[in-house]
């Protein structure tokens, strides 16, 4: 069980385990875990873990996520077309973006799986999506590179996916007109959330530092800031 301490309110963050589906992939899993400061766990130990059972199955062929605490769960990667909102004509997110502004640059500060970034780029925007967690960045990069559906290939190509702290990097993107921020971890009890989103919510990431963001934005001239949050927040 791995815990990392953050500076914000003495927050403790839970990290996923790394494991393997075949003994032939042990070395690959170990290298993946070392790159991202994660803990490797044997499959049999994962199933009896008393802390949590969220895992990245790492192999030379694929990267898959699974939460074994959920009954009948299966390993998965991101199937972007299963998120119908990406191609939907009208969604709450799409209403925030005018078709007249298509082609402009958007800076997504909380990329995650790049699901919202892909929905925005599907409208024709150029999206720079920044993800802080290196393991999540590598997993999502793998999923984006393996998109086979022609109807969203162009949208994927309009995403510039970056690994780093968005608040450290924001000054590098002063040419972007729109800032997008999703506090996706606010609504943890939503049973309707897809397994992909629930996987991240169950890891109890630290909340985005809005105070630091406010100070940073004072030094920039972005034309629009779109902040997505649960209604109760």
Question: Each predicted region: which residue ranges?
Answer:
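Conserved SAM-binding loop of SAM-dependent methyltransferases across substrates and taxa
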Residues: 113-125
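Conserved beta-strand/loop positions that form the S-adenosyl-L-methionine
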Residues: 109
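Short SAM/SAH-binding signature in class I
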Residues: 176-181
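Conserved SAM-binding motif I beta-strand of class I
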Residues: 126-131
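Conserved Class I SAM-dependent methyltransferase catalytic core
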Residues: 210-233
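Mobile active-site "lid"/loop adjacent to the S-adenosyl-L-methionine
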Residues: 184-212
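S-adenosyl-L-methionine
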Residues: 5-104, 132-175
